[in-house]
Amino acid sequence: MIRLATLQVLITSILLSSNNHPIILVHGFLGWGKEEVGDKNYWGGENDIEKYLNDRGYQVYSVSLGPVSSTYDCAIETFYQIKGGQVDYGQEHSEKYKIIRKPEGKIYKGLYPEWDEENPVHLIGYSFGGLTNRMLLHLLNSTFLKSKDGEFEESYLLGNSLRGWIKSITTMSTPHNGSTLSDIVIKSLPFTDNLPVSYTHLTLPTIYSV
C-alpha cells in the first residue's frame, strides 16, 4: 500500500513540471481496486489517496486489474477501464492461451472517455503496475496481426497505432529487471506458468522510476 505523502509529492512534481492531464494509478501484483478489500485502500491503506487528491483539485483515477494476471492482460484491461468499452484481448492471444476474448463481465463506461492523443494521461504504477504501464505503451504504439494472411486485429487498441496517448509513465519500486518472487508464485500456483509475462524497453514518452 502506498503512503499519501509519497504519492502526493510525485503527483505534484508531475503536474508542476508538465500540465494538468489526468493521472491514472495502476496497482501491482496481488493488488486490488477501490472497495474490493473492505476499508483497506491499496492507495493509502487507512486513507483514500485517490479521493484526497481529487478533493484538492487533482484529476486522479485508479484501475482494478487481475491480481495475478499477465502484463499483457493487465495492459488490455487498463486501456478499456480508462477509455471505456468491451475488453478485447485480441483473437491471436485469446486462441493461443485459450481464454475468452471478450469477457461478458468486463465492459466499462470509462474513467476518462476523452482519452486520446489530444487528451493524454499520466500513468503511475507501483511495483508490477509499472510493467503494466510499459506494456500498455507498447500496445498503444503498435499494430498487431490476427493471422498470417496479414489481417489486422479487429480490436480498436490492437488494430490501430495510438501514439501520443500517454504523457508520462512513473514507476515506483518496479522490478524492471525481473523478480525472484515470480518463480515462487509459479511453483505455488502452477496455472500461472501459462500466463505470458513480458514487457518491452521503450523511451517515449517520459518514464520516471523512483
Regions found by a protein language model. Give the residues of each.
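Active-site catalytic motif of lipid deacylating hydrolases and related acyltransferases
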Residues: N20-V121
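Sec/Tat signal peptide C-region and signal peptidase I cleavage site
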Residues: L15-S17
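Sec-dependent N-terminal signal peptides
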Residues: L4-S13
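Serine-dependent carboxylesterase/thioesterase catalytic core
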Residues: F79, Y89, S94-L202
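Single conserved hydrophobic/aromatic residue that forms the stacking wall/gate
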Residues: L204-V210
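Active-site-proximal flexible loops/turns
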Residues: K34-E35, T71, R134, T180, ...
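Active-site loop signature of alpha/beta-hydrolase-fold enzymes
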Residues: G31-W32, V68, L131, N177, ...
